Curated annotation (Swiss-Prot):
Gene Ontology MF terms: rRNA (uridine-2'-O-)-methyltransferase activity
Transmembrane regions: none
The species this protein was found in: Pelagibacter ubique (strain HTCC1062)
Protein name: Ribosomal RNA large subunit methyltransferase E
Subcellular location: Cytoplasm
HAMAP family found in the cross-reference section: RNA_methyltr_E
Family affiliation: Belongs to the class I-like SAM-binding methyltransferase superfamily. RNA methyltransferase RlmE family.
Cellular compartments per GO CC: cytoplasm
């Protein structure tokens, strides 16, 4: 009975969510697209013709927005889960943390890339502090990978959670990049500890 009540509450919440409704109008696969749109509007991440890597891409709303924005550029997306095709997007089904997957990504670019984004998060354990730690580890691995892949003026965007690893992630960002900001989009649910770290210009 409790599970059914939770499911009904979730469904009702989704129906009331303006970003869920707007995503259906705009053709995005998830409301998370609007988080990236807000980030882009504030921090000027994307433009036509650039090269981008999207880590943890499924179900694909970030890749959809990036594809529409970079147009003639190059976009490579990776996720453990397969997803429907997206125009102007090369998709890899695999675990980003595997070296083999990282080598596949590198092989698809002849030179350094302009942007790396990550919306990766672990499967939730139900213990928020543990989830924050594991997701933080993914963010730091993505950040270290971006150092290898980005041009000097490159940009890195990643989901992070407020928790014990938060300061460590920000410190790593400041070690690797000249400009580091933490931002919580309006489209991120108020009750969520989710924020995003935006880094620019490699040291």
């Amino acid at each position: 009975m409790k599970k059914n009540r939770i499911s009904k509450n979730w469904i009702n919440k989704q129906k009331r969510d303006i970003y869920v409704r707007q995503s259906q109008v705009d053709g995005y696969r998830a409301r998370s697209a609007y988080k990236l749109i807000e980030i882009d509007e504030k921090f000027k991440i994307f433009k036509n013709g650039i090269s981008v890597i999207d880590l943890g891409a499924s179900p694909g709303s970030w890749s959809q927005y990036i594809s529409r924005t970079v147009k003639s550029g190059r976009l490579v997306s990776i996720d453990l889960k397969g997803m429907e095709e997206i125009e102007n997007t090369i998709q890899i089904k695999g675990d980003f943390t595997d070296l083999e997957s990282q080598e596949k990504i590198k092989a698809l670019f002849k030179s350094k890339v302009d942007v790396v984004v990550s919306d990766m998060a672990v499967n939730t354990t139900g213990i928020k502090d543990i989830d924050a730690i594991y997701t933080g580890e993914l963010a730091m691995e993505a950040m270290n990978f971006s150092k290898e892949m980005l041009v000097k003026e490159g940009r890195f965007v990643s989901k992070i959670f407020l928790g014990s690893s938060f300061n460590e992630i920000v410190a790593l960002g400041k070690k690797l990049f000249k400009e580091v900001k933490v931002f919580k989009p309006k489209s991120s649910r108020k009750e969520s500890k989710e924020s995003f770290i935006i880094c620019k210009i490699l040291r």
